[in-house]
């Protein structure tokens, strides 16, 4: 007489679900979702400024760009497994901890890259797809393979990869690259050193242990802080080029960019006053992330007509209050 098939116990099913969740969590950590979110904000900013009005194109561009960035991050993780094992900050990542095999990660990255190219090529255009692939090549080839372990300028030159997402967004919207797109590229390019060098000051011992020649390890915190201030000072006027002479954005963005840039420069000045102060380095790193998010958000808001109406009313009210106070004081 045939036996009755036994059902899996609730405990076994629970263990399987838990194992699946762990695998998904490991692959999620592999792609660095927080970094991708920041990169996609620059893509969105470029699309808003370029005048995108197609929600589907907007979604597909962010999806394809995010998948391309994920592919680059996975390949970088595979290549850097040896040094990640030496660093306290990274030794628990999926590859150095053994939760994911390098071969599986490479297959995953290949699937991601093909998916990104296909999505962008089919639903936007070949220029956007090609730019996304070039971002992977620059990040992996120039930064990870060539410069990261050999030069203090690794994140400066290699930072060009992180500046490509706004080009992808612009190309997906317009089918070409204008001066405004390249100004956005320059903003991200100049933003990268203050952002990563602030983190490198915080993790200096980790990088030194792994033999990675980050600027604070080789040149010290003071020179690094001076370089951070230099790049911050360069970035502020570049960010204003979108207002004049390009005329892409208006007074709302101008005010936001000037305020955010001034705050970033002030954070850099504070760090230069005491380059070994970890709290100041952490504050600069955190604000650098916030700066980029808010700057790109200001680009989108500036393209919204209601923003200019409200902004004009607010500035007129402030001017009226100022005039009244002057009259009362005289």
UniProtKB/Swiss-Prot annotation:
GO molecular function, a single term: protoheme IX farnesyltransferase activity
Catalytic activity: heme b + (2E,6E)-farnesyl diphosphate + H2O = Fe(II)-heme o + diphosphate
Taxonomy, superkingdom: Bacteria
Its membrane topology: Multi-pass membrane protein
Cross-referenced CDD domains: PT_UbiA_Cox10 (cd13957)
GO cellular component entries: plasma membrane
Other facts: Carbon 2 of the heme B porphyrin ring is defined according to the Fischer nomenclature.
Protein name: Protoheme IX farnesyltransferase
Source organism (scientific name): Synechococcus sp. (strain JA-2-3B'a(2-13)) (Cyanobacteria bacterium Yellowstone B-Prime)
Lineage: Bacteria, Bacillati, Cyanobacteriota, Cyanophyceae, Synechococcales
């Amino acid at each position: 007489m045939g036996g009755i098939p036994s059902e899996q116990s609730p405990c076994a099913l629970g263990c399987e679900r838990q194992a699946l969740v762990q695998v998904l969590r490991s692959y999620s950590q592999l792609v660095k979702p927080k970094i991708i979110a920041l990169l996609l904000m620059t893509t969105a900013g470029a699309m808003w400024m370029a005048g995108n009005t197609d929600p589907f194109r907007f979604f597909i561009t962010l999806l394809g760009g995010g998948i391309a960035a994920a592919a680059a991050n996975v390949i970088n993780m595979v290549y850097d497994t040896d040094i990640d094992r030496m660093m306290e900050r990274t030794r628990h990542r999926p590859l150095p901890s053994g939760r994911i095999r390098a071969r599986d990660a490479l297959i995953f990255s290949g699937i991601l890259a093909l998916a990104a190219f296909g999505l962008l090529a089919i639903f936007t255009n070949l220029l956007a797809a090609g730019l996304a692939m070039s971002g992977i090549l620059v990040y992996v080839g120039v930064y990870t393979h060539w410069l990261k372990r050999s030069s203090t300028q690794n994140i400066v030159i290699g930072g060009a990869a992180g500046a490509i997402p706004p080009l992808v967004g612009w190309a997906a919207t317009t089918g070409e690259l204008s001066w405004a797109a390249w100004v956005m590229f320059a903003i991200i390019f100049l933003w990268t050193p203050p952002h990563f060098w602030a983190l490198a000051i915080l993790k200096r011992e980790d990088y030194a242990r792994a033999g990675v020649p980050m600027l604070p390890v080789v040149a010290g915190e003071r020179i690094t802080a001076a370089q951070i201030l230099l790049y911050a000072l360069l970035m502020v006027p570049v960010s204003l080029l979108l207002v004049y002479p390009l005329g892409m954005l208006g007074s709302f963005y101008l005010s936001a960019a000037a305020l955010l840039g001034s705050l970033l420069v002030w954070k850099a000045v504070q760090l230069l006053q005491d380059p070994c102060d970890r709290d100041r380095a952490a504050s600069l790193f955190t604000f650098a992330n916030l700066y980029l998010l808010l700057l790109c958000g200001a680009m989108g808001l500036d393209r919204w007509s209601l923003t200019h109406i409200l902004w004009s009313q607010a500035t007129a009210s402030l001017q009226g209050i100022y005039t009244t106070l002057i009259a009362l004081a005289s």
